[in-house]
From Swiss-Prot:
InterPro entries: Ccdc124/Oxs1, Ccdc124/Oxs1_C, LSO1/2. Residues 9-28, 41-65 have a biased composition (Basic and acidic residues). It comes from the Eukaryota. Residues 5-71 form a coiled coil. Keywords: Coiled coil, Cytoplasm, Nucleus. This is Coiled-coil domain-containing protein 124 homolog. Residues 1-90 are annotated as: Disordered. Associates with translationally inactive ribosomes in the nonrotated state. It is found in: Cytoplasm; Nucleus.
Length: 207
C-alpha cells in the first residue's frame, strides 16, 4: 500500500491543476468576449464616422451649389435675382427722388409725423370708430391713471375718471380723432381721402 500522505498530496495537486485549467479556460472566454466587444464598438464608431463624413460632404455640396446659383452668370438664376433687386431699387429711387425734411413741434405733430412714415397702414381710415372707442379709452386709462395719481394726488377715482375722459377727447388714440368714413364709402374714395390727409400733414409739418 502506498503512503496515504503522498496520495493526499497527489490528489491536492490534481485538484489544483484542474482549478488552474478551469481558471485559464474562464479567462480565455472572458478575453474572447472583450475582444468581440471591442471589435463591435470599433465597427460602430467607424460607421458613425463614415455617416458624419457623408453628411458633411452633402452639406458642403449644398452650400457650394447655393453659392454658385447666387453668383451672376449669363442667363443664370443669380443674374435674374440681381436684376430683380436692381429693378426694385430703381423703382424705389424713382418713386422717392428727393427726401423731404419735416419737423414736429409737439406730441401731436410727432404722432402725425410717425403716421407719415407708415402711410401704407390702413388704420388711418376707420369705417367704424365707435366699435373701437371703448377699448381704446380703457387702454388709455390703464396707462394714464398711474401718471395722473402722481401729478394730482389725493383725488377720488371718479375725479380721475372725468379728467382722463376729457383728455381722451383730444388724444390721438381716440378713434374719433382719426380719419373716419362711413361704412359704405368706396375704396377709391377712401384712397383719395388718405392721399388728401397725407398731403395736408406733409404741408403742415414740412420745414
Amino acid at each position: 500500500m502506498g503512503n496515504p500522505k503522498k496520495r493526499a498530496e497527489k490528489a491536492e495537486a490534481a485538484k489544483s491543476r484542474k482549478q488552474d485549467e478551469e481558471k485559464k479556460k474562464k479567462d480565455a472566454e472572458e478575453d474572447e468576449k472583450w475582444s468581440k466587444g471591442v471589435k463591435t464598438n470599433k465597427k460602430e464608431q467607424e460607421a458613425e464616422k463614415r455617416k458624419a463624413a457623408l453628411e458633411r460632404k452633402a452639406e458642403r455640396e449644398r452650400l457650394e451649389k447655393e453659392e454658385m446659383e447666387s453668383l451672376p452668370s449669363k442667363g443664370g438664376k443669380g443674374s435674374k435675382k440681381a436684376a430683380k433687386k436692381n429693378s426694385s431699387l430703381d423703382a424705389f429711387l424713382n418713386e422717392t427722388p428727393q427726401t423731404a425734411s419735416y419737423s414736429a413741434r409737439n406730441i401731436d405733430d410727432a404722432l402725425d409725423l410717425l403716421s407719415l412714415n407708415n402711410s401704407s397702414s390702413k388704420d388711418k381710415i376707420d369705417r367704424h370708430p365707435e366699435r373701437r372707442f371703448k377699448a381704446a379709452l380703457t387702454e388709455y386709462k390703464q396707462s394714464r391713471l398711474p401718471e395722473l395719481r402722481k401729478e394730482q394726488p389725493g383725488l377720488r377715482l371718479n375725479q380721475y375718471e372725468d379728467i382722463m375722459y376729457k383728455e381722451f377727447q383730444k388724444h390721438p388714440d381716440n378713434p374719433f380723432n382719426k380719419m373716419n368714413v362711413s361704412y359704405n364709402t368706396s375704396q377709391d374714395e377712401v384712397e383719395q381721402l388718405r392721399k388728401a390727409r397725407k398731403a395736408e400733414l406733409e404741408a403742415r409739418l414740412r420745414e
